[in-house]
Amino acid sequence: LTDIGATYAEQCRQVLAMVEEAEAQAMGMATKPQGKLRVLSMASFGHHYVSPMLAEFCQTYPELTVEYRTSQNVPDLLAKGIDVSLYLTESLADSRFMARRIGTIFSLLCASPAYLEKYGEPKSLDDLQKHACLRLVNPSITPQWHLVSENSCSYQIDITGPLIADTPELLLDMVQQDMGIALLPTFAVIEAIRTGRLRRVLADWRSPDIGVYTLLPSRHFIDAKTRAWLTWVEQYISPKIQSDTEYFL
């Protein structure tokens, strides 16, 4: 479909959803989530936060069918016909979406104890140039590491290393195999750091805050199934995000 065609198709889908909701209301079922709910999440975030609670959500709403997809790219809700997306970004300015911030995360530097014992622990940001740095890559991430300190200093550093990957999970595995230092999101490393498999490096520095948002196609009407998901996210996912982030503060 062209962009115009995709927009038209989404508008038609919204009209049909409104008609279905009106019919359900007339039959006293407006508040009962049912039908198909299409959810999109960034893959690594979804693995940590969505997967553990998805079965319970489906059991709570047995008349719902959840179509759950993952993506590393900026979601195009209009083209994909997605009802609601979970998305991570430092800034969000796309007027096509209705956004609600549900939490904040950040990324931190970490390495394995064995790597640090062999190559030494960096004492300053300049020392990172002497180390093997493993980097995430996707369209929303720059080739540099942008770091901020507790006293609001900002630092940007070009890094080099033996590995560039598009998923935090792969980098996490490689860091645990003593390959180098990586800048990884809190949710990806929290268990490894808690158990001692990884250690935080240059703990006074981290990435800028990254907002976690629920995104919906920009519209005034939100049907019962989408409302149920938004409520579930706020009750179960938001507190977990907050707890994980506060662990590192």
Give the location of each predicted region:
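Hydrophobic hinge/microswitch elements
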Residues: 156-200, 207
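Acidic, Gly/Pro-rich loop/turn segments at junctions of secondary structure
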Residues: 69-165
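Alpha-helical "hinge/linker" immediately C-terminal to small N-terminal DNA-binding modules
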Residues: 1-28
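Short, well-ordered beta-strand segments
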Residues: 38-40, 85, 134, 182, ...
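C-terminal effector-binding regulatory domain of bacterial HTH transcription factors
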Residues: 10, 186-195, 205-249
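Central regulatory/effector-binding core of bacterial HTH transcription factors
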Residues: 35-94, 246-249
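Alpha-helix/helix-capping structural signal
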Residues: 43-44, 113-114, 169, 187-188
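Alpha-helical segments flanking ligand/cofactor-binding loops in enzyme cores
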Residues: 100, 126, 172-173, 227
